[in-house]
Amino acid sequence: DVRASQIPWALDDGVGTMLPVMQSDITLSYGSKVLIIDAKYYAHTTQVQYDKHTLHSNNLYQIFTYVKNKDSEFGDKPHEVSGMLLYAQTDEAVQPDNTYMMSGNRISVKTLDLNCDFSEIANQLNAIAEGFLTSHKPAGGC
């Protein structure tokens, strides 16, 4: 199943007054596996502080929040919820391509080369989906 979806807040008391809607860009679901993808486009895919490239904090907080709230929906049932920040590739020397395990969930950061024929872009997206289905193999470029 591939779709954009709303992710409910995991509220202890059920009171969600003034909380924003969590809307994923893409959610892939297959059996007990879920991959939430948030697509981003920036002139700079990383931020630089003190000559060190780091991920945009707000983006990482956002995908982590989506994943942890979706993860809580499963309760004690066997499941795997992962998240991915998917950036459009820029001409910068540093391009994010990392996977982290955070509080029991896989969070990946990838770049997508949009400077290709559509068939190559489709191949990159298919590689992401296949990697998700088969233990997260790395996705290729054009």
Place the predicted regions along the sequence by residue.
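Catalytic core segments in nucleotide and nucleic-acid processing enzymes
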Residues: 1-142
